Every structure is written in C-alpha cells, then in structure tokens.
C-alpha cells in the first residue's frame, strides 16, 4: 500500500460516491474519493500529480506503482541526536537509519547518512519539504512524483562531508513488503 498525498475538500463524499472529477475554476484538479468508511460530510481528492503518475505508469499496459528508494529515515529535531551526528544548527535533514538490501540505496547510502535535499529541495528536520511558501509536504511526495526507472538526486552528509548521490527507482515499493498484498 502506498501512502500518497490526498487533499481535503469542502464537498461531502459519502460511501459509494467516489470517482468523479473535482473541478475548480473550470479545470479538473483531481478525482473525488472517500478515505474513511465512517466519515460523513468530509471529502478528499486525489490530486492531479498522482493521477498523472498513474496514467504515465499504465501507458505500457501494466501498473507497476511507485518506486521505493530503499531507506527509512528518522527526524533530526532532537538536539541530542543532532549533536551525536554533528549536525550544525543551521543544517536541516533527516537521518537514514535503515538501508534495505538489494534496494536502490544499497551500496550508495549508508546508515547514519544525513539526507539534506531531494532533487534540490531542502528537507526539514521533520522530514518535510516546502512545496509552496509556508506549505510543507513529506519528502516522500518528491519520490512519488518519479516513475520507475527515473533517477532521484539526494544531497547527503556522510562523516561530516557533503555528497551528492543518485538513486535509480528500479523496483516498486511493494517488492520490499514482508507479506505481499493479495496473498
């Protein structure tokens, strides 16, 4: 299962009414969906970047989903953690605390790397990236914008040295689950 961006809207979408277009200013901006079985008068939509990703993905007749870079992170908001990893007060980023074997990150990133940017966007200590002035999304949204086969550039700090690395999204995230869906 993917954890993708959704937008809360001020239109009620009750059970069974998902799937229609969401229109704003005369343009389709997403697809209406219901996210909770027991919610009423709360609507959500799947925004166009996720829909565009899906449409590009299925051009070859199959849906592969979203890539997974192969690492897990921990926030760097705790001052003691920042001291332990020698992160300066003016530096932001997240700590790579797990690297999956045979993943895009395997052999490129290491546990203890501080990931400071994704595709040139600064990652905050809580794992968010500013996408509009004063508005933040989880850094994984920038991963989700990429198709399988794309390369994602990360800025990291390893052993107090800044580095640039690139990870090729070569496997869907579902391949890294311990139990595969629908089994």
Q: What would you call each of these model-derived segments?
A:
Residues 104-106, 117-153:
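PDZ domains, with a preference for the canonical peptide-binding region formed by the helix
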Residues 1-40, 89-97:
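Active-site region of chymotrypsin-like
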Residues 8, 12, 57, 61-124:
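PDZ/PDZ-like groove recognition
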Residues 9, 18-22, 26-31, 46-47, ...:
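Terminal peptide-recognition signature
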Residues 30-37, 48, 119-120, 171:
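Short beta->alpha transition motifs characteristic of CBS
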Residues 5, 44, 163-167:
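Short beta-strand segments
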Residues 83, 126-127, 134, 141, ...:
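C-terminal, low-ordered peptide segments at domain boundaries
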Residues 1-2, 33-44, 55-64, 178-183:
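Flexible, gly/ser-rich surface segments that form the specificity/activation loops bordering the active-site cleft
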């Amino acid at each position: 299962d993917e954890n993708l961006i959704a937008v809360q809207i001020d239109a009620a979408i009750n059970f069974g009414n998902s799937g229609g277009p969401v229109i704003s200013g005369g343009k389709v901006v997403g697809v209406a969906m219901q996210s909770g079985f027991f919610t009423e008068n709360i609507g959500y939509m799947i925004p166009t970047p996720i829909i565009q990703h899906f449409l590009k993905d299925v051009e070859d007749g199959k849906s592969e989903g979203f890539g997974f870079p192969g690492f897990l992170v921990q926030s760097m908001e705790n001052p003691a953690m920042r001291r332990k990893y020698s992160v300066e007060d003016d530096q932001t980023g997240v700590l790579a605390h797990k690297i999956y074997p045979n993943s895009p990150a395997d052999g490129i990133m290491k546990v203890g790397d501080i990931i400071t940017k994704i595709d040139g966007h600064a990652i905050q200590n809580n794992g968010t990236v500013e996408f509009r002035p004063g508005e933040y999304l989880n850094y994984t949204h920038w991963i989700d914008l990429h198709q399988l086969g794309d390369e994602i550039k990360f800025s990291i700090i390893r052993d107090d040295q800044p580095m640039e690395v690139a990870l090729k999204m070569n496997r869907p995230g579902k391949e890294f689950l311990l139990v595969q869906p629908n089994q």
